[in-house]
């Protein structure tokens, strides 16, 4: 009887753990989702979002519907970084609506307040260096308020750069030089540097790892929208030819 009771208890415990793991796994996004190569793939994914987009919508209408959804989206409190994901995605959309690439970034202080926000401006300003994170940090460092957060060019502890997309090599190194932590909303399996951090020269790798460098705690819907904004250039083939 005692053995039977123990066995039943073990079965119950395993079933509970399995169900909990299943719920966690179901909340994650299939890694394959974060690879998009064609306009057709992108449109299918846009239509699948709860934004009311249909395949025949003009590009401008698709983006406006996405913008309306983002504007009314309430960050999920189960995900500690969802409010920053929304803010970064809103910046990314601003760039897209201007004809630029869909990446945005925000700077967060140690209290969790967003103190700066910006977006990719490469196309708009004809500047190869103006990735979202680069634009964010440069404009912040030029601002009057930056003085209280900086020691010459290194930021005081507790600041975080949150990007809508996984930073590239240039941006990851720039963030590392400032001493800020790095977080991002959507992974970049084909171009992100965080997941390839071991390939950095040893000095830059060690510098980057002195701070937190990680995927943000974001809802699946924010991750997917960040990905779709990143690849929105496929809609009209914008950028250098």
Which sequence ranges carry the predicted segments?
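Mobile, glycine- and charge-enriched loop segments
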Residues: 136-165
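Short beta-strand scaffold segments in enzyme catalytic cores
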Residues: 103-109
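Short, glycine-anchored, charge-dense loop/turn motifs used at functional sites
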Residues: 109-115
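Short beta->alpha transition motifs characteristic of CBS
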Residues: 115-123, 211-216
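Bacterial N-terminal signal peptides
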Residues: 7-16
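Zinc-dependent deaminase
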Residues: 20-94, 167, 173-241
């Amino acid at each position: 009887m005692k053995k039977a009771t123990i066995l039943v208890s073990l079965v119950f415990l395993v079933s509970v753990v399995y169900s909990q793991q299943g719920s966690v796994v179901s909340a994650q996004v299939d890694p394959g989702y974060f690879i998009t190569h064609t306009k057709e793939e992108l449109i299918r994914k846009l239509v699948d979002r709860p934004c009311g987009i249909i395949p025949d919508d003009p590009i401008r209408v698709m983006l406006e519907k996405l913008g309306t959804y983002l504007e009314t989206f309430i960050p999920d409190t189960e995900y500690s970084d969802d409010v920053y994901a929304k803010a970064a995605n809103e910046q990314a959309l601003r760039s897209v609506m201007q004809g630029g690439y869909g990446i945005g970034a925000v700077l967060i202080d140690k209290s969790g307040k967003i103190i700066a926000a910006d977006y990719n401006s490469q196309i708009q300003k004809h500047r190869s260096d103006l990735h979202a994170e680069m634009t964010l940090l440069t404009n912040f460092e030029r601002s009057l308020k930056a003085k209280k957060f900086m020691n010459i060019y290194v930021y005081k502890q507790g600041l975080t750069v949150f990007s809508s997309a996984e930073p590239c090599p240039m941006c990851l190194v720039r963030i590392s030089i400032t001493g800020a932590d790095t977080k991002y909303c959507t992974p970049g399996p084909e171009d992100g540097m965080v997941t390839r951090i071991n390939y950095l020269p040893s000095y830059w790798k060690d510098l980057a790892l002195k701070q937190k460098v990680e995927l943000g705690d974001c809802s699946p819907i924010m991750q997917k929208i960040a990905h779709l904004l990143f690849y929105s250039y496929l809609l009209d083939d914008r950028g250098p030819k």
